[in-house]
């Protein structure tokens, strides 16, 4: 369905690959097998697929377009990826999304546990932003003002939106 939508929009898909791995060696191999005429990397799916696509964009210095199918975390927009390196999960630098396309009907159709996980991820930002500032004040980290602003806006939007349950129309607005 998505491929036909891209085609109808005049977007030529040069390479289509279904991933079942986040092993860094596999991702590197796939990234450098992409045609040289590739203009962007699109990640459509859950966390593993998004992380793999982000890292491919990073390696090839290409824009990365994120198309998440669940809202279990905000990883679809972050500039890091969780990959397997020597069979261990590691966080590596990746490409921040150039654009994010979200079909709220797809997000709504995901299992509720993913929405609750996303709520937990959002609520944790409230304290993590203060932790980040504290670390910066004590020389343990550097604050990225843009990332801080985006996170604060997301938290403020979430806590100020008047919804009672995840089924309310305003919840995913």
Q: Which residues does each PLM region occupy?
A:
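A generic local structural motif
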Residues: 27-30, 50-52, 86-88
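A polyampholytic, Gly/Pro-enriched intrinsically disordered region
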Residues: 32-42, 84-93
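ATP/NTP phosphate-donor binding region
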Residues: 1-40
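A glycine/threonine-rich phosphate-anchoring loop and its flanking beta-alpha core
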Residues: 58-160
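Glycine-/small-residue-rich active-site loops that bind phosphorylated ligands and cofactors
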Residues: 21-22, 48, 71, 107
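A short, small-residue-rich loop immediately preceding and capping a beta-strand
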Residues: 34-56, 60-71
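Oxyanion-binding "anion nests"
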Residues: 157-173
